[in-house]
Curated annotation (Swiss-Prot):
Assembly information from the UniProt record: Heterodimer of an alpha and a beta chain.
UniProt protein name: Integration host factor subunit beta
Gene Ontology terms: cellular component: chromosome; cytosol
Any matching Pfam family: Bac_DNA_binding
GO term, biological process aspect, one: regulation of DNA-templated transcription
Domain of life from the UniProt record: Bacteria
Function field: This protein is one of the two subunits of integration host factor, a specific DNA-binding protein that functions in genetic recombination as well as in transcriptional and translational control.
Source organism of the structure: Nitrobacter winogradskyi (strain ATCC 25391 / DSM 10237 / CIP 104748 / NCIMB 11846 / Nb-255)
Keywords from the UniProt entry: DNA recombination, DNA-binding, Transcription, Transcription regulation, Translation regulation
GO molecular function: DNA binding; structural constituent of chromatin
Segments of this protein annotated with the region Disordered: 57-76
Family: Belongs to the bacterial histone-like protein family.
Length: 101
């Protein structure tokens, strides 16, 4: 699912909201998550999961084409850990679909 599909589904389930308003809300939520991560904060959505930033140290890498050793700078990468309720639902839904197969 892409963002536009998410917006469309939310708008369908909430006919009192205009689709452009739903899009603005979704964008605002995502912008706030990114801003919090940029500040170094952890974003926890209970039952869904938690977003955080992991810091990868600088290391020696290798160019796969030439085999040359190259330095790789340190970097920060986003990390998402699923919440307990999401894991349980995914496992329950997966078990149900496998039983029906």
């Amino acid at each position: 699912m892409i963002k536009s599909e998410l917006v469309q589904r939310i708008a369908e389930h909430n006919p009192h909201l205009y689709q452009r308003d739903v899009e603005n809300i979704v964008n605002a939520i995502l912008d706030e998550i990114v801003a919090a991560l940029a500040r170094g904060d952890r974003v926890e959505l209970r039952g869904f999961g938690a977003f955080s930033v992991k810091h990868r140290p600088a290391r020696a890498g290798r160019n796969p084409r030439t085999g040359e050793h190259v330095p790789v700078d340190q970097k920060s990468v986003p990390f998402f850990k699923t919440g307990k309720e999401m894991r349980e639902r995914l496992n329950r839904d997966n078990a149900t679909s496998e039983a029906n197969a």
